[in-house]
């Protein structure tokens, strides 16, 4: 299982500190998904070797302009293992763009309806069940976050849309174990399997994208005959 993190300067902890904590929490890897204006320098291989967890390069695109978002997605698609879009004004754009992997916290500054859920399912865009405000907010904001998660869960279930789960940690102190997240999920109506599946989905996305970029893949739907007579099918 993996967790998507915001490292310094987007957050308050270094990539190395996140990796160390993730290892102690039982994770197999972390996705560094800093916003585009807060990128960080790190040696993924060195950190992985030191702490025994994979460090995945990600990006969370944040803008209110769809044209700019489209350009940024195209720019980062070949440079990052996971491309996320910051939810809100870009919810519709994100679910209609197959190059987007994850629509991050779609309920925080926006909304999701049946049309968007269906589009996400058709285009393979993962909704994020973001438990950050459930864990760290209180009062009305926490209630609103819980209501948003429940509504999103109903739509995801109805349309069988893909999803990921995250505590959205900006500090290593906010990185929760899968067991802790599952327990929190149960208090707001999620079963444990849904939470662990959502944490595992980060790794599934990474594997899929790396496979798509492999030398054997020319374009979706193309079958390539290898020298040994076998075929590689690039269709997803």
Swiss-Prot record:
SUPFAM superfamilies: PHP domain-like. InterPro entries: Pol/histidinol_Pase-like, RNase_P_comp-3_arc, RNase_P_p30. Pfam families: RNase_P_p30. Gene3D superfamilies: Metal-dependent hydrolases. Coiled coil: none annotated. Belongs to the eukaryotic/archaeal RNase P protein component 3 family. This is Ribonuclease P protein component 3. The lineage of its organism: Archaea, Methanobacteriati, Methanobacteriota, Stenosarchaea group, Halobacteria.
């Amino acid at each position: 299982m993996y967790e998507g993190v915001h490292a310094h300067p987007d957050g308050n902890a270094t990539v190395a500190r996140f990796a160390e904590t993730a290892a102690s929490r039982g994770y197999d890897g972390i996705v560094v998904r800093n916003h585009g204006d807060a990128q960080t320098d790190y040696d993924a291989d060195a950190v992985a070797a030191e702490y025994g967890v994979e460090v995945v390069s990600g990006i969370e695109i944040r803008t209110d302009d769809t044209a700019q978002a489209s350009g940024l997605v195209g720019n980062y698609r070949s440079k990052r293992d996971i491309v996320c879009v910051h939810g809100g004004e870009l919810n519709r754009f994100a679910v209609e763009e197959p190059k987007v992997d994850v629509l991050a916290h779609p309920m925080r500054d926006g909304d999701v309806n049946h049309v968007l859920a269906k589009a996400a399912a058709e285009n393979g865009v993962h909704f994020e069940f973001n438990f950050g405000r459930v864990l760290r907010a209180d009062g009305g904001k926490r209630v609103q976050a819980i209501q948003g998660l429940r509504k999103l869960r109903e739509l995801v279930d109805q349309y069988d849309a893909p999803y990921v789960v995250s505590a959205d940690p900006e500090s290593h102190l906010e990185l929760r174990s899968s067991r802790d997240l599952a327990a929190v999920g149960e208090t707001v109506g999620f079963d444990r399997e849904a939470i662990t599946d959502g944490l595992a989905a980060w790794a599934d996305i990474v594997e899929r994208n790396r496979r798509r970029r492999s030398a054997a893949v020319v374009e979706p739907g193309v079958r390539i005959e290898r020298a040994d007579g076998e075929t590689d099918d690039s269709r997803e």
